[in-house]
């Protein structure tokens, strides 16, 4: 590694140890030319999860955007913000590939809300599925009601 003080092209590692709870390696280096020491950190750089939008554009996954949608759906509902926050901020860990469609994110969020709170589920579904009539709302509510009856048996 190049010395930041004199620009010498090669330095030697004097000490190396784990840092940041094992997420980085801290190295003390010494320049053979000027004798100065400096510290470097080596970290893994993860590629961000990319979201493929409906129009084909790609953008990095933003857990805050998902959280905003969940909070809106759960407004004035007996749902802990911490539960929603945990879902949004661990979402990337549950995705196996480098890309996910916005549709898949919506479906995973719907499945999560369906287990958590049916009213929040309907609110989220109405925006996500773009309900364009009262009949669509009623259809979705009936499907939830029949699900509740099956679980109650």
From Swiss-Prot:
Gene Ontology process terms (BP): negative regulation of DNA-templated transcription
Span of domain ATP-cone: 49-136
Species per Swiss-Prot/TrEMBL record: Thermus thermophilus (strain ATCC 27634 / DSM 579 / HB8)
Protein purpose: Negatively regulates transcription of bacterial ribonucleotide reductase nrd genes and operons by binding to NrdR-boxes.
Cofactors: Zn(2+)
Keywords: ATP-binding, DNA-binding, Metal-binding, Nucleotide-binding, Repressor, Transcription, Transcription regulation, Zinc, Zinc-finger
InterPro entries, alphabetized: ATP-cone_dom (IPR005144), NrdR-like_N (IPR055173), RNR_NrdR-like (IPR003796)
Family of the protein in this entry: Belongs to the NrdR family.
Manner of cofactor binding, per the entry note: Binds 1 zinc ion.
Zn finger limits (unnamed): 3-34
Protein name: Transcriptional repressor NrdR
Molecular function (Gene Ontology), one example: DNA binding
A UniProt-annotated Pfam family: ATP-cone
Superkingdom as given in the UniProt entry: Bacteria
